[in-house]
């Protein structure tokens, strides 16, 4: 449908690109004029542009001369004079879009000249990269252009002091990673003094490798968490039980969704093993959860593919980059289940103090732009969620890479044999080869096979990313064979060594199709940079995960009927189309999942914005007296309306309950009597009680200085808001975990989540008002009161891997007894534990 509409009305991004061609003509027309200027005159142009903006001009009014100035500065500082196509890319970024530029086309330079224009407003511009190495490298190389033109530059990275971060954010241009920006935002909304904040209002962000950050990591939440004490015995017991279960008989596993669930027989075994009547009883929720997570750890999570064990710890492997994500933990107890599975020490779970996804963080910027080599396949998502068009920028030189059709083998062994033979043949000629794998396991299989053939090679995967830049740099040299997991080394160009062009350039060999076409395109794009020669080809088998998930059984049966050998490939455009169709289906599923996550996240986003805005008002306010008085009035109104509703006659009102609450929470023991309340209308009751409460409040204030009282109120309010918000995050998270079950009752889970979430938020606000009122009236005003954090938090990145953003939940801790050696075994066999599953313990 979208394609048909485009044929009729045209692609808006391409229309804009044609308009931009005319603007580029104007920029190029100023080239000679800029060359005549001295360095000082060129620098003074920045002051001139800023003055025009202060007088009311817009960035669009000055974009042509500003780009011309930045272009000339790049030529003088770096000896890199931007091409015409790079100016087209810079304009796309200036307009808040995504510039899709092929590998080696100079995206970083494009971003630099576009950012110069945005930075002229003086509101702070963030250049976002995926890791600290790239942020530092770009600042050292390209940051000099900004400094040459009189702008300030800062680097924001992990481990800086508060003062260093404030200085970095105060600069005109700040280089940072996406993680650090998100964590700083969360930390800023947990500070106890406004002076402790580091970020300015979010103005403009330019995201490098935008698809990686806004698509691949969109569902991964950034979390500030605090540890919580929890017994870990149950993880071990669930792990011991799950080990004896049999597939299909006791549980089922769906490879498409990676979901595992117990069968009726499995449930019966669990009930016998743990000596309970009903596993699905409310009091066994925690046990059920532990069994399910342990089952997932054993069946759906694979060592050296989803995670590795290093130094006695389970370390997650990023499914998109193949890198180890140290410090990041699977949430919702899955990490603990993996620790139990691997026989490691089970660590404590944590409580969420603050959380945000990249989707919601980056949508808060006034203006957003991005660069990548592959975004067109996700154009719909960028437009619908972030309001950005993908503009495909032409290459400076035509692409000379040959993309060969896929080769499909019957078995995985046949495929790997063919891969190694092809590498051996190319290696004899001296032509460099880059082998792309989808996980650590595959890279090590290929590596072992090459070692047996005595072919020297480098392996670039999650286990040795420290040498990444060095390995990638040499990957284009004569005779180099490099095995890389997915897009390890992204952001670093592979340049051809001497004599390689004559051999045909770099050959990229993919050992498996990724579920996303974009990731495959990134791998292909490693060859043929800036018009270089090169080639690419994918080797597939009917046993590959993508093929298995989307019905390769018929094709495999056909190959067997034809009597095809394991090492005999099919090279057919029909098969390639089938693979692409499968990829489109997976991409569609993933987009739908991200869209659904965003719809649920939007509920929390709205609530978070309200809380953070009100918290900021508390921090900035010198006098909270009016706010406190309003909270007291609201509390009184609520108590009266609850116990004395107008729907009942006065004789049925519970005046005793009103008096008990008011005396216990807001006044002294005999502050108000039931007798005083009798015979009054609801409004009169509210007026009388409010008058008494406010009189007591003013009397308390008179006992201390006004300054002491105001600080006392601020401390109480910050502590209460932070504690209640922390609990609310947890409750909303628990609500979200089970909300999908409402669909069985013909209710829309999203609508139910919104409705119940709103009610819970309203209840939290009421609790804040009541608690603040109580503490202000009942607590003793202390001298030199110090503001303290409710809980000490640390930044963590839970993985989205099949968990979306399920954060660690706090549930009631129930006692789980140790299994004695002579007790019945938990597997339900009827034998003693010591003679069954505990025999080797």
Curated annotation (Swiss-Prot):
Residues given in the record as Zn(2+) binding sites: 825, 827, 836-837
Region of interest (Disordered), ranges: 788-822
GO molecular function, one term: protein-exporting ATPase activity
Membrane topology qualifier: Peripheral membrane protein
Entry's EC annotation: 7.4.2.8
Biological process per Gene Ontology, one example term: protein transport by the Sec complex
Pfam families (UniProt xref): P-loop_SecA (PF21090), SEC-C (PF02810), SecA_DEAD (PF07517), SecA_PP_bind (PF01043), SecA_SW (PF07516)
GO terms for cellular component: cell envelope Sec protein transport complex; cytosol; plasma membrane
Claim: Translocase is one of the keywords in the record: yes
Catalytic activity, as annotated: ATP + H2O + cellular proteinSide 1 = ADP + phosphate + cellular proteinSide 2
Keywords in alphabetical order: ATP-binding, Cell membrane, Cytoplasm, Membrane, Metal-binding, Nucleotide-binding, Protein transport, Translocase, Translocation, Transport, Zinc
Main location as per UniProt: membrane
Keyword ATP-binding listed: yes
Cofactors required: Zn(2+)
Residues the entry annotates as binding ATP: 86, 104-108, 493
Class in the EC hierarchy, top level: translocase
Task of the protein: Part of the Sec protein translocase complex. Interacts with the SecYEG preprotein conducting channel. Has a central role in coupling the hydrolysis of ATP to the transfer of proteins into and across the cell membrane, serving as an ATP-driven molecular motor driving the stepwise translocation of polypeptide chains across the membrane.
Subunit structure: Monomer and homodimer. Part of the essential Sec protein translocation apparatus which comprises SecA, SecYEG and auxiliary proteins SecDF. Other proteins may also be involved.
Listed name of the protein: Protein translocase subunit SecA
Phylogenetic placement of the source organism: Bacteria, Bacillati, Bacillota, Bacilli, Bacillales
């Amino acid at each position: 449908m979208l394609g048909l509409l485009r044929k009729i009305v045209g692609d808006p991004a391409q229309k804009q690109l044609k308009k931009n061609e005319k603007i580029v003509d104007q920029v190029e027309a100023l080239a000679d004029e800029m060359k005549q200027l001295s360095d000082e005159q060129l620098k003074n142009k920045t002051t001139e542009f800023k003055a025009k903006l202060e007088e009311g001009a817009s960035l669009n009014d000055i974009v042509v001369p500003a780009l011309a100035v930045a272009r000339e500065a790049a030529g003088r500082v770096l000896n890199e004079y931007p091409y015409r196509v790079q100016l087209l890319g810079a304009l796309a970024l200036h307009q808040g879009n995504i510039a899709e530029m092929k590998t080696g086309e100079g995206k970083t330079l494009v971003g630099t000249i576009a950012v110069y224009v945005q930075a002229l407003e003086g509101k702070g511009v963030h250049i976002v990269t995926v890791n600290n190495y790239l942020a530092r490298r770009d600042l050292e190389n390209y940051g000099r252009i900004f400094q040459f033109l009189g702008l300030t530059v800062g680097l924001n990275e992990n481990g800086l002091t508060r003062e260093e971060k404030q200085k970095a954010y105060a600069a005109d241009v700040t280089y940072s990673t996406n993680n650090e920006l998100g964590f700083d935002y969360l930390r800023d909304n947990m500070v106890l003094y406004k002076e402790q904040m580091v970020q300015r209002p979010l103005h403009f962000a330019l995201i490098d490798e935008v698809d990686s950050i806004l698509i691949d990591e969109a569902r991964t939440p950034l979390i500030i968490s605090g540890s919580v004490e929890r017994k870990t015995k149950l993880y071990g017991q669930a792990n011991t039980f799950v080990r004896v279960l049999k597939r299909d008989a006791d549980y089922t596993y769906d490879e498409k969704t990676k979901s595992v669930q117990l069968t009726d027989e499995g449930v019966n075994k669990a009930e016998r093993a743990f000596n309970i009547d009903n596993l699905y009883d409310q009091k066994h929720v925690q046990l059920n959860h532990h069994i399910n997570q342990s089952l997932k750890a054993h069946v759906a999570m694979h060592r050296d593919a989803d995670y590795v064990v290093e130094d006695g710890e389970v370390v997650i492997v990023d499914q998109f980059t193949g890198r180890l994500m140290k410090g990041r933990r699977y949430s919702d107890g899955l990490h603990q289940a993996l620790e139990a599975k691997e026989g490691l020490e089970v660590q404590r779970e944590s409580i969420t103090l603050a959380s945000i996804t990249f989707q919601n963080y980056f949508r808060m910027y006034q203006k957003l732009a991005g660069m990548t080599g592959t975004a067109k396949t996700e154009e719909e998502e960028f437009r619908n969620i972030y309001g950005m068009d993908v503009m495909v920028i032409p290459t400076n030189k035509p692409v000379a890479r040959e993309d060969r059709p896929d080769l499909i083998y019957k078995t995985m062994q046949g495929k790997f044999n063919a891969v190694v033979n092809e590498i051996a043949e190319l290696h004899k000629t001296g032509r460099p080869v880059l082998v792309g794998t989808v996980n650590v396991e595959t890279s090590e299989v290929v590596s072992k096979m090459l070692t047996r053939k005595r072919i020297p090679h480098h392996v670039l995967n999650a286990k040795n990313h420290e040498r990444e830049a060095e390995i990638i740099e040499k990957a284009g040299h004569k005779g180099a064979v490099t095995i890389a997991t997915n897009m390890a080394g992204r952001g670093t160009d592979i340049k051809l060594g001497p004599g390689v062009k004559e051999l045909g350039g770099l050959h990229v060999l993919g050992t498996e199709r990724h579920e996303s076409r974009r990731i495959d395109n990134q791998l292909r794009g490693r060859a043929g940079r800036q018009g270089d020669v090169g080639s690419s080809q994918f080797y597939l088998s009917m046993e590959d995960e993508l093929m298995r998930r989307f019905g390769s059984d018929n094709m495999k049966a056909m190959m067997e009927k034809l009597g095809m050998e394991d090492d005999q490939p099919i090279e057919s455009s029909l098969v390639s189309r089938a693979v692409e169709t499968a990829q489109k289906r997976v991409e569609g599923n993933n987009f739908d999942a991200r869209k659904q996550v965003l719809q649920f996240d939007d509920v929390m986003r709205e609530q978070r914005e309200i809380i953070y805005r009100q918290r900021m008002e508390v921090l900035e306010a010198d006098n909270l007296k009016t706010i406190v008085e309003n909270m007291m009035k609201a509390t009184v109104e609520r108590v009266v309306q609850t116990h004395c509703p107008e729907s009942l006659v006065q004789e049925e009102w519970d005046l005793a309950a009103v008096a008990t609450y008011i005396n216990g929470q807001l006044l002294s023991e005999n502050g108000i009597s039931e007798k005083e309340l009798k015979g009054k209308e609801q409004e009169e009751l509210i007026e009388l009680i409010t008058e008494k409460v406010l009189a007591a409040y003013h009397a308390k204030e008179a006992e201390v200085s006004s300054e002491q009282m105001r600080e006392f109120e601020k401390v109480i309010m910050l502590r209460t808001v932070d504690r209640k918000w922390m609990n609310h995050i947890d409750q909303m998270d628990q609500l979200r975990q089970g909300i999908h079950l409402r669909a069985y009752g013909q209710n829309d889970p999203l609508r139910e989540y919104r409705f119940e979430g709103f009610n819970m938020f309203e209840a939290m606000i009421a609790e804040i008002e009541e608690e603040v009122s109580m503490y202000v009236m009942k607590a003793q005003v202390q001298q030199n009161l110090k503001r303290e954090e409710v809980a000490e938090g640390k930044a963590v990145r839970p993985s989205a891997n099949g968990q979306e953003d399920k954060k660690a939940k706090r549930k009631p801790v129930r006692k789980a007894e140790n299994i004695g050696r002579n007790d019945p075994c938990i597997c339900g066999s009827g034998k003693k534990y010591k003679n069954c599953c505990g025999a080797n313990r």
